Design a protein with these regions (language model features):
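PLP-dependent amino-acid enzyme catalytic core
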Residues: 1-417
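Small-residue-rich alpha-helical packing segments, especially N-terminal targeting/signal peptides
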Residues: 420-526
Length: 526
């Protein structure tokens, strides 16, 4: 399987190179050169699998067996621990750089990042929003020599591996909600995707292209660039980001739309390059008529106000005693609109990305009460530490200098290992775990949106690690698998259970991040 840039000016690469990369050198995003097509027999087989097993089978279609032995992708479900920054605090082999947008995330989210006063945690409070934070990250990744020197890697949805594992959400949702897989043709299922940067939406479009009969509904808040693009072909910025209760979706530049445009254009890199270069230059572009037609056929969309978010949270609690986070409520609001119209519809699944505990402002706005965990209450009384990145500062230089300083510190005392730069998304996901003394699971299940983390994971311990497994990386992957996070799924079933019933459904598994263990191990053995 080869991977190509959406803009067509970068060399094609294999999965390993796609995994350890961010933006392509030409500014595009990596996509598979070809998509596998799945028949009815494969769908039947996959419908009986657990979520981790489904992820494993899906990944095997996109990763050559010569790169990833099957033993390296074992996994079982379970609960994650705390957020990534909490997981690695004090670890001797990890440094974390966190960039948070001051005023654009909840107080709890900010405290979770700024109250960790360990030597290996470096938090910056940026006077900017998430789109503005993307710019220095993109600039850093555009410097190919710098990226190679420091082995930098992005694990937000810029990285193909992030989108790949999200494809499994849509297959699993379909298998849980489809009335039967024996119908000809297969019955469709509607998947409502609360959308910010559009990574999960891109995953859904890929699942469609692979043969999964789903209809995608894009649910956005008042930052409605995707809604306007689908409705009228207007891919243009508003005057400013609008702060909403669903703060993780307060995004004006949904960069994964480039992947969707490329997919629906028939992989026409020339068209996409011209389109995206115009957008980057003028902040506004009208989609070509044919591309807009294909987009509106593939997905529909709705924009949801803060008032609708709070009404949905209240209604879901009243009807189901289930407390939605505001992002989940954006999706469920679309569901309620269809229910209230009493229009016939296929089974429907709403993806639910986060816990309401991190959004007390939204809970209060919905006139609901929240049983706040003691760990979150304790944050109010902790000392905080945060270095400002002010408007007018050179954020790119500050980020580069920090990465270089940390690399220099490590290189002066430890062998060079694996460095990762991560932009943390709003949903639960596992990054990487190394099996060895002093190492911990790196995961985010607490919506610490907009963070950039540099994770330095050293391969020093792999050759000497005592383990009965013939592959230390496999042991590490198995250990990481025990700490996956199950997120609740809300769906409109046909089996008689109440609409909106919470079920253990969409698992934010990040199996592919474990692949990094395998590569790190093999390089150290060489």
């Amino acid at each position: 399987m080869w991977y190509v840039s959406t803009r067509g000016m970068a060399p094609r690469i294999d999965f390993k190179e796609a995994l350890f990369s961010g933006y392509a050198p030409d500014g595009g995003l990596y996509m598979p050169e070809e998509l596998p097509q799945l028949g009815r027999e494969t769908l039947h087989e996959w419908s009986t699998l657990s979520y981790p097993s489904l992820v494993k089978e899906l990944c095997s279609l996109f990763i050559g067996p010569e790169l990833i032995p099957r033993d390296d992708l074992n996994g079982t479900s379970g609960d994650t621990g705390s957020a990534a920054i909490e997981s690695v605090q004090g670890a001797k082999n990890v440094d974390i750089i966190v960039l948070l947008p001051k005023g654009h995330c909840t107080k709890i989210q900010e405290l979770q990042m700024t109250t960790v006063l360990r030597e290996n945690v470096h938090v910056f409070g940026v006077e900017g929003n998430s789109d503005e934070l993307d710019e220095p990250i993109k600039t850093v990744f555009a410097d190919v020599a710098f990226v190679k020197k420091h082995n930098l890697m992005s694990l937000n949805s810029i990285n193909w591996s992030r989108v790949l594992v999200q494809i499994a959400h849509h297959f699993f949702a379909y298998f849980r909600c489809a009335p039967s897989l024996d119908m000809h043709p297969l019955s469709p299922v509607e998947v409502v995707v609360p959308t910010g940067a559009a990574g999960n939406l891109a995953a859904g479009c890929i699942a469609q292209k692979m043969g999964l009969p789903i209809h995608l509904v894009v649910a956005v808040n008042s930052n409605d660039i995707i809604h306007r693009t689908i409705q009228w072909g207007d891919f243009s910025l508003s005057k400013a980001v609008k702060p909403t209760l669903a703060s993780a979706m307060d995004i004006q530049v949904p960069y994964n739309m480039e992947r969707i445009f490329w997919l629906l254009s028939g992989s026409d890199s020339q068209v996409i390059r011209a389109l995206m270069e115009q957008f980057e230059s003028t902040k506004s572009v009208s989609l070509p008529k044919e591309l807009h037609s294909k987009l509106s056929e593939a997905v529909t969309s709705q924009s949801v106000s803060d008032e609708a978010i709070t009404q949905t949270m209240g209604r879901c609690w009243q009807e189901n005693q289930y407390l939605l986070c505001p992002h989940s409520a954006v999706a469920v609001s679309c569901h309620y609109q269809q229910v209230d119209r009493q229009q016939p519809s296929p089974p429907r699944c709403c993806l639910a990305p986060a816990s309401a505990a991190k959004f007390p402002e939204a809970v209060r706005a919905a006139r609901l009460t929240l049983d706040t965990p003691a760990e979150i209450l304790a944050l109010e009384h902790k000392e905080a530490r945060c270095t400002p990145m002010r408007k007018g500062d050179d954020w790119t230089r500050m980020l580069r200098d920090t990465i270089e300083d940390l690399s220099q510190q490590w290189q002066s005392g430890l062998p060079v290992g694996l460095s990762l730069v991560v932009l943390v998304e709003h949903c639960a996901w596992c990054i990487l775990e190394l099996a060895g003394p002093g190492t911990k699971l790196l995961c985010d299940c607490t919506s610490t949106r907009y963070c950039v983390m540099t994770l330095k994971v050293w391969s020093l311990g792999f050759p000497k690690m005592q383990t009965p497994s013939p592959h230390p990386a496999a042991a590490a992957a198995a250990a990481a698998a025990k700490s996956l996070q199950l997120c609740p799924t809300l769906y409109h079933p046909r089996d008689g259970s109440p609409p909106g019933s919470p079920v253990p459904g969409i698992l934010q598994a990040r199996t592919l991040e474990w692949v990094a263990i395998s590569f790190s191990n093999r390089e150290s053995e060489k």
